UniProtKB/Swiss-Prot annotation:
It holds the Pfam family 2-ph_phosp. Its EC number is 3.1.3.71. It catalyses: (2R)-O-phospho-3-sulfolactate + H2O = (2R)-3-sulfolactate + phosphate. Keywords: Hydrolase, Magnesium. It comes from Rippkaea orientalis (strain PCC 8801 / RF-1) (Cyanothece sp. (strain PCC 8801)). Signal peptide: none annotated. GO terms for molecular function: 2-phosphosulfolactate phosphatase activity; magnesium ion binding; sulfopyruvate decarboxylase activity. Its cofactor is Mg(2+). This is Probable 2-phosphosulfolactate phosphatase. The keyword Metal-binding does not apply. The keyword Magnesium applies. Gene3D superfamilies: ComB-like.
């Protein structure tokens, strides 16, 4: 297995794709996706464009859909939910499709959607991600951070480092570092693995969410291995629970 870390979707190569792309948006899209599927959503369908989301979701019965999204961390006006994973309860999600648009995570998903396998990862489902990669052993793996509007983010990098460190520990000689970003991500995780919430508070997007009174979201997003669910792309932009 050869492992690569890319801090934003814009930094990924444009002339080829990996065997498996792992999209990371810890604050908060991939945390929300995992939580929604664990809570019983039949699928999560992601969109970059709000108008496209509205057009597609209009084809679904109101009782079978939930529209969720944020721009700049704040809920999109007229939507059912924002992008808080804490809103993804079984009562809200059960048997419904979540139509989701976010500032960063949905852009990253679109960038790699043509890869043979696309999964999403966050701190809360790190071990499920690692288990899948160890079981399937894809030849090339990209860990793609969503960043913030094209820029680097601490929280996505530390999650990539958590996944990479577990893979390196398990595979020892059976893994190759595809770029220096892998080593840097592991180093960041090694430094903050016992205090992820502190790191999130220091990150620019974490501070943005704190200003929006999303303290509880940060606490939730910082809990390692809380869920055993693995979101996997069934078709472009549509994620389901891997079984």
């Amino acid at each position: 297995m050869k492992l690569f870390v890319y801090h934003t979707p814009e930094l990924t190569p444009t002339d080829h794709l990996p065997d498996c792309a792992v999209v990371i948006d810890v604050l908060r899209a991939t945390t929300t996706i995992a939580t929604a599927l664990e809570a019983g959503a039949e699928a999560v369908q992601t969109f970059r464009d709000i108008d496209q989301l509205m057009e597609t979701s209009d084809r679904w019965l109101p009782e079978k859909r939930i529209r969720a999204g944020e721009r700049g961390g704040a809920k999109v006006e007229g939507f059912d939910l924002g992008n808080s994973p804490l809103d993804c309860t079984p009562e809200q999600m059960g048997g419904k499709r979540l139509f989701l648009t976010t500032t960063n995570g949905t852009r990253a998903l679109q960038r790699v959607e043509k890869s043979p396998t696309v999964i999403t990862a966050a701190i809360i489902n790190r071990q499920a991600t690692v288990n899948y990669l160890l079981d399937r052993q894809p030849e090339t793996v990209w860990l793609v951070g969503s960043g913030w509007e094209g820029g680097y983010s601490l929280e996505d990098t530390v999650c990539a480092g958590a996944i990479a460190q577990s893979l390196v520990t398990a595979l020892v000689q059976g893994i190759g570092m595809g770029n220096d970003e892998v080593t840097a991500a592991i180093a960041l995780y090694s430094q903050f693995q016992n205090n992820l919430l502190q790191l999130f508070h220091q990150s620019s997007h974490g501070q943005r969410l704190l200003r929006l009174n999303c303290d509880e979201d940060l606490k939730y997003c910082a809990q390692p291995d809380l869920l055993g669910v693995l979101p996997i792309q069934k078709e472009p932009s549509v994620l389901v629970k891997f079984c």
